[in-house]
Amino acid sequence: RLVMGHTQGKGCYCFVNGLLSAQVGKRAQNYKYIVVDNEAGMEHISRGILPGVDAVILVSDCSRRGIQAVGRIARLIPECGLKPKKVGLIVNRAPGGVINDGVREEIEKQNLELLGVVPQDEGVFDYDSAGTPTTQLPADNPVRQELYHILEGLGL
């Protein structure tokens, strides 16, 4: 397991970034999709470690400050030389699966495309607390259903 955002030495990500670049390069031709899940930020992208990016999916909690942070990251995408076909936002852990007017206003202010709203769910909390993979959530779980809906809408 490769964990981004943790240094191998004082302030240096070189080893981890080199490892990521080599592994993605070796495997890219064998897969239709490669998902890179990382902590907030664009370091490994800005350093040119990934050969190309088709989609950037930004995930935020259901707060105005979270949306503002995602907006700042979205504005960095062109500065990093990326030209993804799709840039979008998923709001996670929304109470009742609904975003309020303030959060919706901030999404519009940040000029973000809303891909979907994932509800806060006790089932996910229970699975996580028990160490059970969330991939085992039942098909009728609202989080699972929303994620399938988002994936279908991406059209990748």
Sequence positions of predicted segments:
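Residues in well-ordered beta-strands of folded domains
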Residues: 3, 90, 135
